[in-house]
Amino acid sequence: ASFQZAPPGBAKAGEKIFKTKCAQCHTVDKGAGHKQGPNLNGLFGRQSGTTAGYSYSAANKNMAVQWGENTLYDYLLNPKKYIPGTKMVFPGLKKPQDRADLIAYLKZSTA
């Protein structure tokens, strides 16, 4: 299933998902710095593995995916399948609604 078929995302619900499943490793605010994972500010339109000051796996750099709604929707289903060799240990969000909500939140919070 593609992002086009996804339910409309709810950024408020996405914020809750981010806080419970993502915030232990990622920040979204400009200049917030990196944690175990990279800061996600400016995520949309950026190429994977290119955030300055973060040590990415070769897999992330070599994948050279452009992050957007479609790529994030697929990636967040199963990160290790989408980018084999990624350092991200998160197993993914199986529910289309959860992925759509998280993407809606990320669009607002990382812009």
Curated annotation (Swiss-Prot):
Positions annotated to bind heme c: C22, C25, H26, M88
PROSITE patterns for this protein: CYTC
Disulphide bonds in the chain: none
UniProt cross-references to InterPro entries, sorted A to Z: Cyt_c-like_dom (IPR009056), Cyt_c-like_dom_sf (IPR036909), Cyt_c_1A/1B (IPR002327)
Modified positions (N-acetylalanine) in chain numbering: A1
GO molecular function annotations of the record: electron transfer activity; heme binding; metal ion binding
SUPFAM superfamilies: Cytochrome c
Subcellular location field: Mitochondrion intermembrane space
Post-translational modification N6,N6,N6-trimethyllysine, affected residues: K80, K94
GO-annotated cellular components: mitochondrial intermembrane space
Primary localization: mitochondrion
PTM field: Binds 1 heme c group covalently per subunit.
Keywords recorded for this protein, A-Z: Acetylation, Electron transport, Heme, Iron, Metal-binding, Methylation, Mitochondrion, Respiratory chain, Transport
PANTHER family in UniProt: CYTOCHROME C
Similarity comment: Belongs to the cytochrome c family.
Known role: Electron carrier protein. The oxidized form of the cytochrome c heme group can accept an electron from the heme group of the cytochrome c1 subunit of cytochrome reductase. Cytochrome c then transfers this electron to the cytochrome oxidase complex, the final protein carrier in the mitochondrial electron-transport chain.
Entry protein name: Cytochrome c
Organism: Gossypium barbadense (Sea Island cotton)
